[in-house]
Design a protein with these regions (language model features):
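Accessory, charged alpha-helical segments in nucleic-acid-processing enzymes
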Residues: 1-188, 280-292, 306, 320, ...
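ASCE P-loop NTPase helicase motor core
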Residues: 88-97, 104-105, 175-288, 346-360, ...
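Helicase C-terminal subdomain and adjacent C-terminal extension
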Residues: 546-586, 619, 680, 705-814
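Conserved helicase/translocase motor-coupling segment
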Residues: 609-675
Length: 921
């Protein structure tokens, strides 16, 4: 039962107020109190000698933590304002000052779900014997694996009634409310627009995700998060599945002079190494700055933050424009090759226009020209538009240059579009120079360092030097964590590096796509807040087929939510599945590693063109070495090894350490390493994640694309390791189906390379994506039958079916895009293949309703025609349809005709598209 009050009486000798347990009654007097003690005696006290606190309220069924330690003997808190008394039944504590050292949490009433998930985890560990492969390969099914005994013991020690940890929120599917940011966020390690957003999101949210594609500065972002947590007196653990990732963080901090607050713990060997080499040095006087300089820094950082936000926005616009320019120039190069225009004719046509076109007007002119039937007279309105809107002086030009005029407009569009981009680039570059972008960023970093350094100086000047060792640091952990608020560890060993029950303020999981959910759950139990850093398009944790079947059976047995599926999800994907839109996720967009054309493939294929490429490069970065021998046996290919060896010795003599050779199979990688010159490094892709080389050589080994070597995560990582050059060694006979990762990669390499050297002339032209995407925009604006989509009712339905359902909802079609009203003349490279009447039909602006194409290399894949019943029963239209069918058959482009009276269109499109792509239905 609670006491009605607590009372402190002033000791006459010490003049200190002391808690008195033996007071029975208190009576308020005019000038003080009359106090009756439990022995029956009463005394009067002046008001200056008494502190009286009446009972306010109780909290029952609670857990009480003092300085992070659970007081398990108490379950109720009585609140007296400035003081708290803890009790269980009639057993009570002395009063505690109400302060930040005390945490009061409601006891969880139901942990059935949590226990079920943990039972599922235990069954996996007990039956499979371990968690996931360290070195996954195709042919080696039994590599060294992490001992499950450590994990099972750790699971048994986790307190599922602990409600303060991130594990509690993760298992309950809760994400606590967003917090208010500190007034000053610092970036002593530099930043860009995305990194600033990521740091702020991490500090505001209890659970957050940072998606960091290759070369986007994940480590720099982590360092800035750490700096802000330190100045807020927070503790942080940084973990990864392997030591190399966290050691990278350590090396960066030590290299910049900030090793003073970092402890590299984890397994026994790491701990021993850390404490054996531990030397406490006094904080450097270089970190000390004047009060005036600190005040200036705190003022300037706010002003610079606003300026830099604008600078970052414009810097990203500039990079995006440069990527658009590169794409436009490559596409224009294809147009010049596939739709050549005589320079004299071009000059003559230039003179026919008295008004200069712009790129948008060129597209509108193309639309108008496509609507003109060659044998029909021009309407008066059309003549006026040609003369006054587009500046065409001589209307006889339409007849004189009937074959060349649309090609001329196509060329003109690219010239003007490229000119527009170059003008925009120049304008933004001038803006950035005038606003001192680089100088302001450097000042921003310097003032951030000033604030960070002075905090460290003041903190470490006050800390007493203590001798910590591997055998005593746990017993002195309160002091240890003050000296070393940043702990580095593997995910497996974090819980063994800290006292039981200790919670970090923050946990950062790096390379999270490789971390399974069991080890993640253990780490979550050690922290209040979590930042998960990784890339869902890179390598994930690996589970062998036998273990996968066992784990899937347990999932069904325990009825486990898909979000906690050990087989399907690493921790990054688990959080996405669990929280969907209810977790803050920031994509680091700015890419700083690869040649623009190299990362361009990854950007288009895997990142939905969201990356902002900050690199440059004048060289062409791709090479394809074709061998005339097909795939080898035993998962290796000696001819590819020989070709790789020859190329390296010819092109990288004396620079062998700049080259990495990647193979999908361990056997091939081992034989590569045996034959390569010293310094060149050959391995499977799993050893290259998180690293980079000037040149990467990828050996396909096989001559057919199978599921193992065509893994999208593997190809993405392989390509994005290359800084300057990416080379593929492959059999000449290798088929390249649309939609496969290797197929699209090779197609992209051919598409972007030197046209004269590598493009094999066939009968089908590439799709001019930019021209028709922009043209479709103008085309739609001309039509009023629908606010968003133009065309007949049937075409509108088909547009929505393709664009909103079929293409976006099937991962197999991630590289397929669509254009409308595509001109046959833009598809047919060689008119000499056809008789005069068919060639004339092609020239007469005949079009395909829908063209599906591979957006990686612009190759046409499938044509779709929507046939109205009454219209297409017309004899003249039937003749046109026959000619169109013949043309498409001749150039080898599959055609699907859909009738407005047909049915099951969606399934027919999917079947036809799969067949055209070489996929099995």
């Amino acid at each position: 039962m609670n006491q009605p009050f607590i009372i402190y009486l002033k000791n006459k000798l010490t003049s200190r107020f002391e808690y008195s347990r033996n007071v029975k009654y208190v009576t308020l007097l005019n000038n003080g109190y009359r106090i009756t003690f439990t022995n029956g005696r009463s005394y009067n006290y002046g008001a200056d000698r008494v502190k009286y606190y009446p009972f306010l309220y109780s909290q029952n069924n609670v857990r009480i933590y003092v300085r992070g330690k659970l007081l398990s003997e108490y379950s109720t808190v009585d609140n007296y304002g400035a003081y708290l008394i803890f009790r269980h039944g009639n057993f009570s504590s002395s009063p505690f000052d109400k302060n930040n050292d005390i945490e009061i949490c409601s006891i969880k009433q139901d942990v059935i779900k949590e226990k079920t998930v943990f039972d599922y985890f235990r069954q996996i560990l007990q039956s499979i014997g371990e968690t996931s492969f360290d070195i996954p390969t195709d042919e080696n099914k039994n590599p060294n694996q992490i001992s499950a005994d450590i994990l099972l013991k750790a699971l048994d020690n986790i307190d599922l009634y602990e409600s303060r940890s991130a594990l509690s929120n993760y298992l309950a599917g809760k994400n606590p409310a967003v917090r208010t940011l500190y007034d000053t966020i610092i970036y002593p390690f530099g930043c860009n627009e995305s990194q600033k957003k990521a740091v702020e999101a991490s500090l505001r949210n209890s659970l957050s995700i940072i998606e960091g594609p290759p070369g986007t500065g994940k480590t720099q972002t982590i360092l800035n998060i750490v700096a802000n947590l330190i100045v807020q007196n927070k503790t942080v653990a940084i973990v990864s599945n392997n030591n190399s990732a966290v050691f990278n963080v350590r090396d960066k901090l030590e290299g910049l002079g900030y090793g003073i607050f970092v402890a590299s713990l984890g397994n026994k060997e790491n701990k021993e190494t850390f404490f054996e080499t531990l030397k406490e040095y006094p904080i450097s006087d270089n970190f000390k700055i004047s009060t005036k300089r600190l005040q200036d820094a705190e003022k300037n950082i706010i002003e610079l933050n606003s300026i830099l936000n604008l600078c970052f926005q414009n810097r990203n616009k500039l990079a995006t424009l440069k990527t658009k320019l590169l794409d436009a120039e490559v596409e224009f190069g294809h147009l010049i090759t596939e739709q050549p225009l005589n320079s004299k004719i071009k000059l003559d046509l230039d003179k026919k226009f008295y008004r200069k076109l712009d790129s948008n007007k060129a597209l509108k002119l193309k639309y108008l020209l496509l609507k003109i039937e060659p044998d029909n007279k021009l309407s008066f309105i059309t003549k006026l538009r040609l003369i006054f809107q587009y500046g065409l002086i001589d209307l006889n030009t339409l007849d004189e240059y009937s074959d060349e005029l649309v090609t001329y407009v196509n060329h003109k569009f690219y010239e003007l579009y490229i000119e527009d981009i170059k003008n925009d680039i120049q304008r933004i570059e001038e803006w950035l120079i005038s606003h001192d972008e680089k100088e302001n960023l450097n000042r921003f970093i310097e003032v951030s360092k000033d604030i960070f350094n002075v905090f460290l100086f003041r903190k470490y000047k006050q800390l007493a030097q203590i001798s910590f060792g591997v055998n005593n640091y746990i017993s002195q952990f309160d002091d240890f964590i003050k000296h070393y608020p940043v702990i580095l560890s593997s995910t497996l060993s974090l819980h063994t590096s800290i006292p039981k029950g200790f919670l970090f303020d923050y946990l950062i999981i790096d390379e999270s796509s490789q971390v399974d959910i069991i080890k993640s759950a253990l780490c979550f139990s050690c922290s209040r807040n979590v930042v998960v850093v990784g890339d869902s398009m890179q390598l994930t944790h690996i589970v062998d087929e036998q273990s996968k079947a066992t784990a899937e059976a347990f999932q069904k047995e325990y009825n486990i939510s898909p979000a906690y599926d050990y087989v399907r999800h690493n921790i990054l994907n688990s959080l996405k599945s669990l929280y969907a839109e209810n977790i803050k996720s920031v994509l680091l967009k700015e890419h700083y590693r690869c040649h623009p054309i190299i990362i361009g493939f990854c950007n288009k294929k895997y990142y939905n063109n969201e990356l902002v490429v900050m690199t440059g490069g004048d060289n062409h970065p791709f090479k394809i070495i074709e061998t005339n021998i097909a795939g080898g046996r035993g998962n290796y290919n000696q001819r590819q090894i020989d070709e790789t060896d020859f190329y390296i010795r010819e092109n990288y003599f004396g620079k062998y350490d700049k080259v990495g050779i990647i193979a999908p199979y361990r056997n091939h990688a081992n034989k590569l390493q045996q034959q390569m010159p010293e310094g060149a490094e050959a391995d499977t892709i799993h050893k290259f994640q998180g690293r980079e080389k000037d040149a990467i050589i990828f050996n396909t080994v096989k001559n057919n694309i199978n599921q193992f070597i065509d893994n999208p995560n593997l190809i993405n990582v392989a390509v994005s390791r290359a800084v300057k050059e990416f080379i593929v060694v492959m059999p000449e006979s290798m088929e390249l189906p649309h939609g496969t990762n290797i197929g699209d990669l090779i197609r992209y390499m051919y598409y972007t390379t030197n046209l004269n050297d590598t493009i094999v002339k066939g009968n089908i032209s590439s799709v001019f994506d930019l021209l028709y995407k922009e043209y479709n925009r103008v085309f739609i604006s001309f039509l009023s039958s629908n606010k968003n989509i133009g065309g007949s009712a049937a075409e509108i339905i088909m547009h929505k079916l393709l664009n909103e359902k079929i293409l976006p909802n099937n991962p197999l079609y991630s590289s397929i895009d669509m254009v409308r009203e595509y001109r046959l003349r833009d598809l047919v490279r060689n008119l000499q293949l056809f008789e005069d009447d068919v060639a004339q039909f092609i020239r007469r602006n005949s079009r395909i309703d829908f063209l599906l194409y591979n957006k990686i290399d612009k190759t046409p894949v499938l044509a779709i025609e929507v046939d109205g019943v009454s219209f297409h029963s017309n004899e003249l239209q039937q003749e046109r349809d026959r000619k169109k069918d013949y043309v498409l058959k001749t150039i080898g482009l599959p055609l699907l005709r859909l009738s407005t009276e047909g049915h099951n269109e969606e399934q027919r499109i999917i079947e036809s598209l799969n067949e055209a792509m070489g996929l099995k239905n």
